[in-house]
Regions:
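Glycine/threonine-rich phosphate-binding loop and adjacent beta-strand/alpha-helix elements that clamp
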Residues: 78
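Aromatic-lined glycan-binding groove of carbohydrate-active enzymes
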Residues: 1-40, 74
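Positions that flank functional sites
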Residues: 19-20, 83, 98
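Short, surface-exposed helix-loop/turn micro-motifs enriched in polar/charged residues
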Residues: 72-75, 94, 113
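Structural preference for beta-strand elements that scaffold enzyme active sites
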Residues: 11-13, 90-93
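Terminal-tail/helix-coil boundary detector
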Residues: 7, 31, 35-70, 85-89, ...
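Residue-level "edge-of-site" marker
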Residues: 18, 81, 119
């Protein structure tokens, strides 16, 4: 879909660039996840750390935190910059519920990821990977090519 949208100049706004909160740092290994309230309360099967898919998410989050630290940004900023680095993406949904979340997301608006950082992310979660069965979908061959998923370095900013 993304190559087609790019070819015809159609805008793309990806859904859930922060992975339902997983890419904000809210859910980390060693921290208790409240399965009785909020999104985790509504969909505990997607947040219960005792389930293998969610345990895997926690492992991946920790690896991505390391990439964010190496890049000099927060996990939230890494995730948002990753999404807008794709040449077919017009904008990213930010979806803050609080002023604190809005302030944090806006503070990362100028974060631009270099190719090494994008490669590190791809190595942790290869393109088209669905960590949780509920996220499963079809992977078109075009997303396996890094150059199709990245704006030129000078055009990656907001």
């Amino acid at each position: 879909m993304l190559p087609t949208c790019e070819r015809y100049g159609m805008g793309v706004i990806p859904w859930s660039p922060l992975g339902g909160g997983w890419l904000t740092g809210k859910y980390r290994r060693g921290q208790e996840i409240d399965l009785t309230s909020g999104r985790a309360g509504r969909m505990p099967q997607r947040f219960d750390p005792s389930l293998p898919g969610n345990a895997r998410k926690l492992e991946l989050v920790e690896q991505l935190v390391g990439v964010a630290e190496q890049a000099g940004c927060s996990l939230t900023h890494l995730a948002m910059a990753f999404v807008v680095a794709h040449p077919a993406v017009s904008a990213a949904i930010i979806g803050p519920r609080t002023m604190e979340q809005l302030t944090d997301i806006l503070a990362g608006a100028d974060v631009v990821l270099d190719d090494a950082t994008l490669d590190a992310i791809d190595a942790i979660v290869p393109p088209g990977t669905n960590v949780h069965v509920d996220d499963a979908g079809w992977q078109p061959p075009a997303i396996a090519q890094a150059w199709r998923r990245r704006r030129p370095i000078g055009t990656r900013g907001a």
